[in-house]
């Protein structure tokens, strides 16, 4: 799906040091990382540079909730992530199994990041239809929800829902800056400066070099850049 996927660190290299070096190179103060063993070690080395998220499968309802509670207590977890189309069986955004997870996130003051729109892998994608977020936002007004990976082809609907629901946000993960949806950028430049924020896809599909080479061409207004690159993520993920 991606061209020029970043090369992994050479065998024998320290992936944590390599990642910190890339962050330094592009002026990245803090990154959100999945809670892998390497990410836990990176957080031990430099807690201020590493915030942690946890991917869970809500099919194991109580098991997922216990994992989230433990990660919050032990590792200062900042977000839970959910890939509805990638669960087996699939768990739609508005499924009762996901609702149990959302309730736990409200109790623990955690943001939840959910894939929205057509999935990249060749999976059925109705479970990620953007309209499903409407009911979730209604039922969980305290929940901080972030749509990730595009929300296409329903990006205009995503904007309408962000206008409607205070807790719904959008991050630009999975897309090179030149392909950010126009409807989302237009929204960020007008009524959504506090709702849209940067996310990359390093090292899964995009190099930081490509991302930061293309970012200056994104037509954001001057006052939108600070919320887009820093302030919105710090607020949504409760970063210090």
Task: For the regions a language model picked out, list residue spans one by one.
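Short, acidic/polar
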Residues: 12-22, 60-72, 155
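A structural motif corresponding to the C-terminal end of an alpha-helix
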Residues: 21-29, 46, 107-108, 139-143
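Catalytic pocket-lining loop regions of alpha/beta-barrel enzymes
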Residues: 78-79, 92-197
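Mid-to-C-terminal alpha-helical segments outside catalytic/metal-binding sites
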Residues: 1-30, 192-197, 205-240
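Short, charged, surface-exposed secondary-structure boundary motifs
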Residues: 61-66, 178-183, 207
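Conserved residues at the C-terminal ends of beta-strands
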Residues: 34, 83, 199
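Conserved, mostly hydrophobic/aromatic
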Residues: 23, 71, 105, 149, ...
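Active-site gating/metal-coordination segments in enzymes
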Residues: 29, 37-120, 124-127, 164
């Amino acid at each position: 799906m991606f061209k020029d996927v970043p090369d992994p660190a050479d065998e024998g290299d320290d992936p944590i040091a390599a990642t910190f070096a890339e962050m330094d190179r592009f002026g990245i103060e803090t990154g959100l990382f999945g809670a892998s063993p390497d990410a836990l070690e990176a957080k031990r080395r430099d807690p201020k540079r590493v915030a942690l998220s946890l991917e869970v499968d809500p099919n194991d309802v109580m098991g997922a909730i216990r994992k989230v509670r433990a990660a919050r207590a032990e590792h200062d977890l900042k977000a839970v992530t959910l890939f509805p189309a990638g669960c087996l069986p699939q768990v739609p955004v508005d499924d009762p199994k996901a609702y149990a997870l959302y309730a736990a996130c409200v109790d623990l003051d955690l943001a939840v990041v959910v894939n929205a729109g057509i999935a990249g892998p060749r999976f059925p994608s109705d479970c990620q239809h953007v309209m499903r977020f409407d009911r979730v936002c209604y039922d969980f007004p305290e929940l901080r929800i972030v749509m990730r990976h595009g929300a296409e082809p329903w990006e205009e609907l995503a904007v309408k829902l962000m206008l409607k629901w205070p807790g719904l946000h959008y991050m630009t993960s999975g897309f090179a800056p030149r392909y950010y949806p126009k409807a989302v950028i237009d929204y960020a430049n007008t009524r959504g400066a506090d709702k849209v924020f940067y996310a990359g896809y390093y090292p899964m599909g995009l190099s930081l070099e490509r991302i930061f080479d293309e970012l200056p061409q994104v037509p954001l207004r001057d006052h939108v850049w600070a919320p887009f690159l820093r302030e919105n993520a710090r607020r949504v993920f409760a970063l210090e």
